[in-house]
């Protein structure tokens, strides 16, 4: 029967902490309280993989003795013998301890240990009468005393904010959380290996920028004391990576952090991880094919399959991704519009006003038809793009770094990839005309002067780099956190960031 007693109160917790501090004080009196001379030679998962299939007779014949260490998660004292569950970085293994083997003093010491303590065990591997793989302790040591009691098994870490704020406790108590971050590591590793296999060169570019650029976003501002100058945490590495293309590195990528001084939501964290890559002699169509394959490889690396379940719906990444223009997406996913209406700036502006958008303020006050259509897409269709879908043909006015189409006025060779209604990637054929780029920067400065806080600055050094000549290039950025949300069936970006940003504790 499950014990559903009330969760421990703060008073109970304070009493338990005091008792544990008293135990630690006694340990200090008797010798080294936190020894650091034990090295395990086995992990729980490896032991299960090797020996779960053997019976006790085979284990006895093998006579395998191991040294394991980890956190004690369960403890059952039954007179002269006890069982404990040890949790290490790979999983859990049962420990069997008996007074006759350990001796009176060591067994008495074990009985004083608490759930959460870090312990070391050495002994042979065997199976209990019930067939559970275990380690029979010939010796047992306390390596690190836990002063704070863990949440009890039934109540666990129920408070979602507590899970984010005290991720260390969440990782101890919640197997699913550990699996999420293991999958994240595998996904990033799979992406990195795929990039290296494709001939890309991994680089690291500055995190502190004298001029923020590479994205439409509000930066964090800081001050460099030694140089006595204002600096910005980077909002994107794009302009530095393209400088490297100018310098002769034809394929570069970077997996690193970006910082944007904006809101927090299930899809946004001020500090987040992006993978940006740039390839000389590539265009946006090549980028779409490459990105599609890259995301499949990440899914397989993290989960073993390109067919996933996300929030109880199937998500099939194995099939070709859809391609739609902004207007095609509105007509398909937002009911009631016609192409003639979408081609009428006054109509689109009126629709946006009905939907609650501030069309009188920046940036929409100065927006042309393309930017208005994009805003309507974001309000009406974006959230409905469950299937992987490339939205293509973005207007020039919202794409200041993208190459303009040779055949369609006002349109760039740009795409954004949406999956489950979220933007996952943004890429384009890069603008490598320095005079065109300078003109677009000037337009961005005008927008900033008119009140658009996310408009870009004029980066004279980047223009100088382009003036040396940049080959035709394609570049793309993939949001690692949002991608991992998909791969791990996580509803919030905070679920896939180890230490997400939270309000300061009172």
From Swiss-Prot:
Q: What are the BP-aspect GO terms?
A: lysyl-tRNA aminoacylation
Q: Which domain of life is it from?
A: Bacteria
Q: Where does Mg(2+) 2 bind?
A: 423
Q: Which is one Gene Ontology cellular component term of this protein?
A: cytosol
UniProt catalytic activity: tRNA(Lys) + L-lysine + ATP = L-lysyl-tRNA(Lys) + AMP + diphosphate
The annotated subunit structure for this chain is: Homodimer.
Which keywords fit this entry according to its UniProt record? Aminoacyl-tRNA synthetase, ATP-binding, Cytoplasm, Ligase, Magnesium, Metal-binding, Nucleotide-binding, Protein biosynthesis
Stored PROSITE patterns: AA_TRNA_LIGASE_II (PS50862)
Recorded hits in CDD domains, A to Z, give:
LysRS_core, LysRS_N
- Homology family: Belongs to the class-II aminoacyl-tRNA synthetase family.
Q: Which organism is it from?
A: Bordetella parapertussis (strain 12822 / ATCC BAA-587 / NCTC 13253)
Might you give the EC number(s) for this enzyme? 6.1.1.6
Q: Enzyme group, top EC level?
A: ligase
Q: Where in the cell is it found?
A: Cytoplasm
Check the record and name the InterPro entries matching this protein: Aa-tRNA-synt_II, aa-tRNA-synth_II, aa-tRNA-synth_II/BPL/LPL, Lys-tRNA-ligase_II, Lys-tRNA-ligase_II_N, Lys-tRNA-synth_II_C, NA-bd_OB-fold, NA-bd_OB_tRNA
What's noted on cofactor binding?
A: Binds 3 Mg(2+) ions per subunit.
> Which GO terms fall under molecular function for this chain's record?
ATP binding; lysine-tRNA ligase activity; magnesium ion binding; tRNA binding
Q: What is this protein called?
A: Lysine--tRNA ligase
Q: Which cofactor does it need?
A: Mg(2+)
* HAMAP family the UniProt entry points to: Lys_tRNA_synth_class2
Binding-site residues, Mg(2+) 1: 416, 423
> Mainly localized where?
cytoplasm
